[in-house]
């Protein structure tokens, strides 16, 4: 049974660990879920977001280039997926009146602390992966 009064949940990167769990949990709660793997929805394609996102949707961006070591040698691809793609999603969401939840990483911080980081701590990524994910955060927030 679907909860018709709730907003549709749109998940990018639904083939990954976080996206798979989120889609399963949302469906188990009876939510209207549109879950897309990276093969089904390339978030680096700005036009694709315009066709998939509807007014009132809640878009959860789980899509990412997650190969931390690989990002060092494939910086262009990491930047495209982790920084440019979230910007496309955010602008499309802002245009149609959808909400965006962007999943990031603790790699945006330096990693040299023993206690948990707080949301307002300084960001000091130490590698390409962390830097591109931080760029994605900035791209997503600047659209709103």
PLM regions: where:
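N-terminal Rossmann NAD(P)H-binding glycine-rich loop of SDR-like oxidoreductase domains
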Residues: 7-28
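Rossmann-fold NAD(P)-dependent oxidoreductase module
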Residues: 21, 25, 92, 139
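Helix C-cap/helix->beta junction micro-motif
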Residues: 29, 95-97, 143
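Adenosine-cofactor binding site in Rossmann-like domains, unifying the SAM/SAH pocket
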Residues: 27-49
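NAD(P)H-binding glycine-rich loop region in Rossmannoid oxidoreductase-like domains
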Residues: 43-81, 92-96
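Catalytic helix-loop patch of NAD(P)-dependent Rossmann-fold dehydrogenases
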Residues: 73, 80, 85-88, 108-144
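SDR active-site strand-loop-helix element
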Residues: 12, 36, 62-63, 100-105, ...
């Amino acid at each position: 049974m679907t909860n018709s009064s709730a907003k549709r949940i749109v998940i990018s990167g639904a083939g990954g660990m976080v996206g798979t769990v989120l889609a399963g949990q949302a469906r188990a709660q009876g939510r209207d879920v549109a879950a897309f793997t990276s093969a089904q929805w390339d978030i680096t394609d700005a036009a694709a977001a315009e066709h998939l996102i509807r007014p009132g949707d809640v878009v959860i961006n789980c899509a990412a280039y997650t190969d931390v070591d690989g990002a060092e040698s494939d910086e262009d691809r990491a930047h495209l997926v982790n920084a440019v793609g979230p910007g496309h999603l955010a602008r499309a969401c802002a245009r149609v009146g959808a909400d965006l939840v962007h999943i990031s990483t603790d790699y945006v911080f330096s990693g040299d602390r023993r206690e948990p980081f707080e949301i307002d701590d300084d960001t000091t990524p130490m590698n390409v992966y962390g830097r591109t994910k931080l760029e994605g955060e900035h791209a997503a927030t600047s659209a709103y």
